[in-house]
């Protein structure tokens, strides 16, 4: 596994904002030529065309992270959002360095849950039901921050994707009676509904209310 502290960004964008598109493309091509096979450039499907054209690999975030970890590249440059580069770093070899060109590139859905909110929810569950580790399996969607993935690991939970979420819920319910799913309530509720759980039995925790 890579070290999440290995994710870097050293780009000063002000230096490039004034460049004409043609100049920017020339700079990119020159950098690619210098780095050669030492770097692999990953572009998520959502990237704009003038970035996408330079990609070595394209696809969804998990696919790209897996492919990058299998490469011999020293530098993994992920043109995507923050959690994508974190996943690439988690899956990377120890000697690989994951680089996110813009550390401000975020995902509004991933930001719907953060560690402080999840830990607060866990404490409230403890106040209401006793030991949450005995009753709840925490499940996070892969589109989430690395610290939420770590929280799930520390509490006997798991990470899911959109395609395996129903199977992950089956796994979770086989171990404990209840599931705490985040950050995407809609994926969690859809997966639960697919398992036959009535919607009125799936509670949405509200961080703005006492005891959610």
Give the predicted meaning of each segment:
Residues 2-212:
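Active-site loop-to-helix "anion-binding N-cap" substructures in soluble metabolic enzymes
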């Amino acid at each position: 596994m890579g070290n999440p502290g290995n994710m870097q960004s050293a780009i000063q964008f002000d230096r490039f904002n004034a460049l004409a598109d043609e100049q920017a493309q020339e700079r990119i091509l020159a950098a690619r030529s210098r780095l050669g096979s030492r770097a692999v450039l990953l572009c998520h499907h959502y990237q704009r065309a003038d970035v996408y054209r330079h990609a070595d690999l394209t696809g969804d975030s998990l696919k790209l992270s897996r492919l990058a970890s299998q490469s011999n590249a020293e530098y993994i440059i992920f043109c995507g959002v923050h959690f994508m580069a974190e996943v690439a770093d988690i899956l990377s070899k120890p000697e690989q360095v994951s680089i996110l060109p813009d550390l401000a590139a975020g995902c509004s859905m991933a930001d719907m849950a953060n560690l402080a909110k999840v830990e607060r929810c866990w404490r409230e569950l403890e106040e209401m039901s006793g030991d949450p580790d005995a009753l709840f399996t925490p499940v996070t969607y892969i589109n989430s921050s690395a610290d939420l993935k770590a929280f799930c690991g520390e509490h006997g939970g798991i990470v899911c994707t959109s395609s395996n979420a129903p199977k992950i819920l089956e796994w979770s319910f086989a171990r404990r009676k209840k599931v705490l799913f985040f950050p995407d309530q809609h994926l969690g509720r859809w997966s639960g509904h697919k398992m036959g759980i009535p919607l009125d039995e799936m509670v949405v925790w509200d961080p703005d209310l006492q005891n959610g």
